[in-house]
A protein has these predicted regions:
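N-terminal maturation segment of proteins
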Residues: 26-515
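Gram-negative bacterial Sec-dependent N-terminal signal peptides
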Residues: 1-24
Length: 515
């Protein structure tokens, strides 16, 4: 979702009355001679194209590499631009008669308006202050995502001389982004808004993992291990020299700079508390995040109560499954390779079972792969990366095989149905492959919708008999339903109700999570 890729900043002195006049003038770009339907389509297309121009990294994931040497602007000034663009789009949208649109067009109209309004919601004073003060964390940050833009098995192309030149240019853009991140963290320190120490320590570990990666698995030197056969020897030599110089002379110094800043300057001042409301403006920011994730006007207390009731409901079903399972346990796999084979088997089983339920399936292939070494320690048990509609990149179900020898790792039917088929892969790729949709509906991400579909996809396991075995059913209950319900309780407890980390851990252990 675009306000996750680049959340907005602005001059907060702008009054509400300033919303319409300059925006209407700036947005007078939709031809009045067009029908309302045509004007809506044009407005949404122009808005999306402008957003991709401002945020080239968002374009990469759609297969648009026209500005592949850039990562976009991460400074506070960029957020002012995003706010102005949202104001402009809302003003232009107001000139289109919603009543004159078809039912499907009204959905597009409402979704577009909602998207722009959420962008503006990010500019509320306390919300914006927090967004600017906390530019990255261990889940959302350039230090975690950048390797995927730097290796041939990631998002970017490495087929032409220009692709290698763009990669070198991106390393320079990374260095500039590090400077912007540090400047924003410094502002947060001045305002008393910091990340928790544990989060900072994880970010330092991420950087250490990348800086210490052996040559054979180092993502930044990976392009040199797969130089195109079409390159002449001279081109290969130039590509090697340029990349080594960029990595050793620009990228690694920037990574070390960020690592040193986090360890020596930021960590000593990072907070020992973990809740959002422990920081200035945290109440407003957390309320914004609840609305962002749910699309509903819920309070933290309401979410907390919902979580408590769901935990009680699920625990009843869980207890029954435990009794039926007896001493049986899911098989454990001690190597990444054996775990991958087990995930393949789960995928084959689910794919065969869901066939009768769906008249069609995405054209884009779904592959199953372990996380790359640079991120397997820090990411979720599994996740999904969309493919490209033209078939040049499949959708990918990623799983964690980190430290498999010491951990009890088992594949899960429920998790495959959530992240893969018929979950995120179906929902995302059906939209991406439908070129009749506006790009916002093809590529936009709304958590309540995307995760809502994935939860529904999981539930089909009961209808299909995939959870008839109490071992599989207990996995679905404990690893899926119960963990989500527990997180509703724990998240709101920590961020709004003053829970300590110890309280959260105890509650999770009491409700099916291993310590």
């Amino acid at each position: 979702m675009k306000h996750r890729v680049l959340q907005i900043a602005s001059a907060l002195a702008m009054a509400g009355a300033a919303l319409a006049a300059p925006a209407a003038q700036a947005c007078d770009r939709v031809a009045a001679a067009q029908s309302d339907s045509q004007r809506l389509r044009t407005l949404m297309a122009e808005s999306d194209a402008a957003f991709l121009d401002r945020n080239p990294s968002a374009a990469f994931y759609r297969g648009d590499f026209s500005d592949a040497g850039s990562l976009g602007d991460f400074s506070p000034a960029a957020y002012e631009t995003e706010r102005a663009a949202a104001m402009c789009d809302i003003a232009a949208l107001a000139t289109i008669d919603r009543a004159a649109l078809t039912a499907s067009e009204r959905i597009a109209y409402d979704t577009f308006r909602y998207s722009q309004e959420r962008t503006l919601a990010a500019t509320e004073p306390d919300v914006l202050k927090t967004i600017l003060a906390l530019p990255i964390d261990h889940f959302q940050g350039i230090q975690g995502s950048y390797p995927g833009l730097s290796a041939p098995d990631g998002v970017m192309p490495f087929a032409a001389v220009e692709d290698y030149a763009d990669n070198v240019a991106r390393h320079g853009a990374y260095a500039q982004m590090v400077d912007d991140v540090i400047a924003r963290f410094d502002t947060g320190l001045e305002q008393g808004i910091t990340l928790p120490r544990l989060t900072v320590e994880l970010m330092i570990d991420q950087l250490d993992t990348q800086l210490g990666a052996p040559e054979g698995s180092n993502p930044y030197y990976a392009p040199l291990r797969q130089l195109p056969e079409s390159f002449t020897e001279a081109q290969k030599g130039q590509a090697r020299a340029a990349l080594i110089s960029a990595v050793e002379g620009t990228l690694y110094p920037a990574m070390r700079k960020l690592r040193a800043y986090l360890a020596d300057s930021y960590l000593p001042q990072a907070r020992t508390s973990i809740g959002a409301t422990a920081t200035p403006g945290g109440d407003a920011y957390y309320a914004y995040r609840i609305a962002e994730m749910t699309t509903l006007p819920l309070t933290a207390e309401e979410v907390h109560r919902l979580g408590l009731s769901e935990v009680a409901r699920i625990n009843e079903a869980r207890q029954q499954a435990i009794e039926e399972r007896g001493d049986r346990r899911p098989p454990v796999y001690k190597t990444k390779e054996s775990l991958q084979e087990a995930w393949y088997e789960v995928g084959r089983k689910v794919d065969a079972a869901i066939g009768p339920l769906f008249l069609r399936q995405p054209e884009t292939e779904l592959r199953i792969e372990p996380y790359e070494p640079y991120r397997e320690q820090f990411f979720l048990a599994a996740s999904y990366q969309p493919g490209k509609a033209d078939g040049s990149r499949p959708g990918t179900f990623y799983f964690s095989g980190w430290n498999a020898a010491e951990r009890e790792l088992s594949p899960s039917i429920r998790l495959y149905m959530h992240e893969g088929n018929p979950g995120h892969h179906f929902q995302v790729m059906f939209a991406v492959e439908d070129e009749s949709l506006p790009d916002l509906l093809r590529h936009g991400w709304f958590t309540a919708y995307g995760e809502g579909w994935a939860l529904y996809a999981e539930s089909l396991g009961y209808e299909l008999g995939l959870y008839d075995d109490p071992v599989d059913r207990l996995q679905a209950l404990e690893d899926g339903e119960l963990k989500r319900a527990v997180r509703l309780v724990v998240d709101t407890g920590i961020h709004a109700l003053g829970w300590t980390r110890e309280q959260a851990v105890e509650y999770m252990v009491e409700n099916g999570n291993p310590r």
